[in-house]
C-alpha cells in the first residue's frame, strides 16, 4: 500500500534547478535512506513532502489518515517549556481525550436519563481509545525514551532554552519517537547524538514497524537500518533496493555502462558525420549520405551528467609554536554551575586529540574556555607562545545574508575575485553556490564555506567542534585525509569513531572530569 506519492516534482531557487520531473513512492513499512551530495536537495525534498515548501510544479499526495512526524536540521523548541513538558506534549491528543473523559464524569451526576446514554457511550469509546494507546503508561514511556537518549541526566524539569544544540535535537527526536507516527522523516538525526545514543536509535529503527525516510551521511548507521536507497543527483531521484553499500555497487556498474555506451555512441556519431560530410555532394552517394543524416537526426543522444566538483582540503601550517600549547591550572568550566572538577592538564605540540563524552558534558565549553571566549568559573588557562589557532564552531547563530564570495572576501580582503572563487570551488562549491547567499545553502554547503576560511589561513593548532556534521561522504573523507596530513596539533570534538580513530593519537574522555552524575 502506498503511503506517499510524489509525481512530476519540479523545483528550484532562482535560476538554480533542484529537481526536474521527479517522482517518488513510499510503501508501507519501507525503510528508506535518502542520499546524495550536499546541495542536491535532500532537505528541500523533505520540506516539500511535509508541506513546509510549495513545489514549482508537481503533486504530493498522502494516503488518508496518515500521521507523518518530521525532524529537520533546523527544528526549534518553544521557549518557556521544560524537557518533560515537551516530551509529554507528544501525547496531547490523548491528554485532550482524558480532559473530555473527566468532563463527562463530572456531568454524569446531573445528567438526565436521555443524556446519560449518550455520555456513557462516549465515555466507553474514550476509555477504549486510551487503553488501546497505553495512555496509562505515558510516564513510563517518557522515562524510557528520555533515559535512552540521555535526557534524564539533564533533568526533565529543565527549561529547553538552556539546552545546547545537540540537547535540543535530542529532545525533539525523543518527542517524535514518542508520537509513534505512521511515517518518520528524519533529517540527519545522528548529527548531535553520542555513540551510545546512536546505537540505541539504530536498534529502535531496526525494530520500527512503520515506514521512515532517513537522510544521513553516517554510512555504517545507514547500512544497518535501511532497505531502500533513493539517490538524488543531477535533479533526478533514482530508487535502489538494498542498503547503501549495495547501492554503491549497482550505481558504479550503471555509471560504467552508461559511460561505455556514451563512448560507443560518440564514435558512431563521429563516423556518421564524417560519412555525410564526404558523400553528400556526390550524386552517386547522396542518398546514402541522406540516410546517414536521418539516422543522426533520429538518434537519442546519450548525455553524461557533469561531474560534481569534489572538495579538496589542505590546511596551511604556519610557524612552529612553543612546546606547550595550553596548560590549565585548577580550571573549572561552566556557566551558572560548574561542569567540571578542577582541571590540570597540558596540551603539547604534536598532539592530535579527540575529545569525547556525552552531550552536555562540557566539550564545547572546554574548547571555548581554552580560547578565552568563556571566562572560567575558577582557575586559569595559559596559552603557549606563537599560537596560530584555527577554530571551527559547531553552531553558527544568526541568518547570514552575505554571499559566499563576500563571506570569504571579508576574511581575506587581499584576495582577488579569481582567488576567492578558486578557493571556494576547491572546497567543493559550484558557481551557483559561490554566488548564492550563505543562508540559502544546505548545512553541508555552509560547513564547506567555513572550512574554506579555515584552510586558507596559516594555523599551527586546530580546535574543531563536530566538523563532520552535515558533510557528505566525499567531503568527510577528504577532511579526514587533510587532518591526517596536517603538521599541526588538533583538538577535535567528534561523535564518529570511524572518523577520528584514523586522525588522532590520543582520546580524552571528559566523563572522567565531569561533575555530572551519569
Where are these regions (language model features)?
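ABC ATP-binding cassette signature C-motif
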Residues: 1-260, 309, 318-518
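Intracellular alpha-helical coupling/juxtamembrane segments of multi-pass membrane proteins
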Residues: 250-305
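Post-kinase regulatory C-tail/linker adjacent to protein kinase catalytic domains
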Residues: 313-315
